[in-house]
Curated annotation (Swiss-Prot):
Membrane topology: Multi-pass membrane protein
Native source organism of the sequence: Arabidopsis thaliana
KW Transcription (keyword) present: no
Residue numbers binding NADP(+): Y188, K192
Listed name of the protein: 3-dehydrosphinganine reductase TSC10A
InterPro entries assigned to the protein according to its UniProt record, in alphabetical order: KDSR-like, NAD(P)-bd_dom_sf, Sc_DH/Rdtase_CS, SDR_fam
EC nos: 1.1.1.102
Tissue: Expressed in roots, leaves, stems, flowers and siliques.
Length: 326
């Protein structure tokens, strides 16, 4: 049997990854797209505070016509003034509960045709499932998941009917707790994991209408809601969550808006989030053949890293549990 020439091996080594890149460039779907923001209508739910308000500021500063929806009329008025003061842009405000489909539909109809829809509302309480009342669980899922269905369903007919307006976008703000379950977040994680299935199925349904879905995964973010939640979250939840650090709302909003404009299906906001997205990409669509290449070649090592994270978390839970039983 003839020996394999070292020169042939040197030739073969780059051919394999280049061939894989060529294949991925042919098969990645949906195809790359750019979503313009300037002079377009951005409608943001949960827009009166936190990430939603930061996104509204950014959209307005980039020349969008901005509408924000939230429950509190007084907070909406404060948000409107802060955006106008910072950007000079007049913002439309709508007071409605996302659990009320009729109220949401009325607000969206009044706001006019939407080009960039950002579904951002969210509620969370960190405590063990056994300590949640059925009403707590229902409220979390109704706002975070059912509310997202309500907003998208209300906006979709007019978005699909758009003619000659360029590519549109529907973005859902999830959480890193929507990629991996975290102690104390059983109800919250369930509500955010549901957005993954919604986004994947929705992208298939609206791609022929030139509508592009983005799923955003922020880490802990320094919002008023997060500050309140930290006061009551279990100690072990804080230990696990610390592995991904925290970010400011403006940082998250920039990452999110950049991802929306790039038409990315998945948007991670920090390095730990990027690793988490690689670990949990599964059947998610991917527009970039370079990122698809990275997902393929790092699948094994990333799984090993994920197992080390799980080991560390379970050790923390074990240690914390022992202190509670003493």
């Amino acid at each position: 049997m003839a020996a394999i020439s070292p020169l042939f091996l040197l030739f073969l080594i780059p051919i394999i990854p280049l061939s894989l890149l060529a294949i991925l460039a042919l098969i990645v779907r949906p195809r790359p797209i750019k979503i313009p923001i300037k002079s377009r209508h951005a409608f943001i739910t949960g827009g009166s505070s936190g990430i939603g308000l930061a996104l509204a500021h950014r959209a307005a500063s980039e020349g969008a016509r901005v509408s924000i929806l939230a429950r509190s009329g007084s907070k909406l008025e404060e948000a409107k003034k802060s955006i106008q003061l910072a950007t000079g842009v007049e913002v439309a405000t709508f007071s409605a509960d996302v659990r009320d489909y009729d109220a949401v539909s009325k607000a969206i109809d009044e706001s006019g045709p939407i080009d960039v829809l950002i579904v951002n509302q969210g509620v969370f309480t960190a405590k063990e499932l056994v300590k949640h009342s059925p009403e707590d669980v229902k409220f979390t899922i109704d706002v975070n998941l059912v509310g997202s269905f309500n907003v998208i369903k209300a906006a979709l007919p007019a978005m699909k009917a758009r003619k000659d307006r360029g590519p549109a976008s529907i973005s859902l703000v999830s959480s890193q707790a929507g990629q991996v379950g975290v102690y104390g977040y059983a109800a919250y994680s369930a509500s955010k994991f549901g957005l993954q299935g919604l986004a994947q199925a929705l992208q298939q349904e609206v791609i022929s209408d030139d509508i592009h879905v983005t799923l955003i995964f922020p880490p802990d973010t320094n919002t008023p809601g997060f500050e309140e939640e930290q006061k009551s979250r279990p100690e072990v939840t804080a230990i696990i969550a610390a592995s991904s650090g925290s970010m400011e709302t403006e940082e998250v909003a920039k990452k999110a808006m950049d991802g929306i404009k790039a038409g990315n299906f998945t948007v991670s906001c920090n390095f730990e989030g990027f690793l988490l997205s690689l670990a949990t990409t599964g059947m998610s669509p991917q527009r970039s053949f370079w990122l698809a290449f990275l997902e393929v070649i790092t699948a094994g090592p990333i799984r090993l890293i994920a197992l080390f994270f799980q080991w560390d978390w379970y050790k923390a839970i074990e240690k914390w549990s022992k202190t509670k039983t003493k």
